[in-house]
Structure formats: C-alpha cells, structure tokens
Amino acid sequence: MAKYNVPADVPDELIDTFIDNMNAATAGTGRMNLFACDQKIEHLNDDFYDGGKKIPLSSNDPGHLFEIGNQCHQQGTIGVLAGQLGLIAQYARDYPEIPYLVKLNSKSHLVKTKQRDPVSQALWDMDDVMSLVHNGINVVGIGYTIYIGSEYEHEMMSEAAQLIRQAHELGMISVVWMYPRGAAVGNEKDPQLISGAAGVAACIGADFAKVNYPAEFEGMSLSLIHISE
C-alpha cells in the first residue's frame, strides 16, 4: 500500500478511516483513476444519446453508468465512481461495492462564457453526504468544480475550501475539478495556467486535482505526447 500524507484537519481518531478511504479510492496506489459520471448535468444528453448512430442506446439509461462502474471496479481499473448525490442515491444500493465520490456542485453547459462567466455552487452539503453514509452507501469522499479565472472564482473557492475541511473532519478525501475558464482566461489549456490551478487546489486543502490535459509545451516528454494522441 502507498504511504499517504494525512492532512492535519483529519482528527486523530479518524486517520485510519481517511487512509482506508484513500486506499479504496486509489486501489492502494496513491494514484486515482476516477470514473467521472457527472455529465448528466454538465453535458446534459449530448454524451448519452444520438439516435443510436454512434452512441449505444443503452447509454441513455443512467443505470448504465453504474453497470460500467461496477464491472470496472471488479476488474480493478477504476478507484471511485464520481457523480452527483442524487444520482448516486438512486442507484448505489444496487451497486454497494463501488467506492463513491459525491460531486457536490454542478452546472449545465447551456450558458456560455461569452454570455456570463461560469459559476457553480453547491447543491448539497456534508449533512446530505453523511445521510448516504449512515444508510450504508460506500462514500469515500467529495468532489467540487472550480472555474479559476471566472469573476465568481472567490465564491467557488470559499465554498470548496469549507467543504474540503468538513470532509477531512469526517475522515473523507476530496477531489477538486480545476478548470481555467472565463472572460479573463485567454487559453484554457495553457500549461502554466493549469499548473497554477492545481496549486490553488492544494492551497484550499484538496487531496487531488482534476485538470485539463495541457497544450504541448517545450520539454514535454514523448510518452506524454503519445498519450495525448
């Protein structure tokens, strides 16, 4: 098993719980392969239905995500399934072995940046998350999206920071989706900007940062270029 850095806001009596959640989320490697299932809000139906042309009709059933997640978890190819609390609540009892990461905020893609800088506020709080835990759902942590560079970034950072602290106090892990976006952002894939966004995630206490793959940059290794292709 990997050795983890346990944040100081995790109570002493919950350190083992935090480590157990880390092991569950990373299969003991310290590296997370997250199965993101938050697109039902984020992308609406764009990724799930096209009349059967390229997307299988089975993909339009929300339960299909959990079938995939369960199979991949059994194979050891994913650590956690990340989704909104409501979606997890609907299906988790049928798939009790999957470790879940509850995504606390979300927004659709309908309002574009040219109309308004993005903002995504929490739809649930930690009491709601704990209600799932008390009902026997295998929740190991929380997730939150921050649009760094938005004029509303301070609102999202403040909310995320408090939720991360509360999650740690309960022995849970946290993942922050860090996406540069807004009128002030010239290039969302700029490597320096993405690196800075990851640093912001560290500063608000996140255990993991989910970022966009950066544009090619000087010194990029061939292995990374091959992955991007």
What are the roles of these predicted feature ranges?
Residues M1-D38, R93-Y95:
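N-terminal amphipathic alpha-helix/helix-capping segment at the start of soluble metabolic enzymes
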Residues I15-G28, I88-R93, D125-V133, E159-H168:
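Short amphipathic alpha-helices and their capping/turn segments at secondary-structure boundaries
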Residues F35, W177, A209:
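Conserved, mostly hydrophobic/aromatic
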Residues D38-E42, Q84-I88, N105-H109, Y147-G149, ...:
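Active-site beta-loop-alpha junctions enriched in small/polar residues
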Residues I55-S158, I173:
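Active-site beta->alpha loop and helix N-cap motifs at the rims of alpha/beta catalytic domains
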Residues N138-I204:
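Conserved anion-binding
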Residues P191-G205, K210-V211, A215-L224:
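A mid-sequence, solvent-exposed acidic-amphipathic segment
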Residues I225-E229:
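Conserved small/polar residues in nucleotide/adenosyl-binding loops
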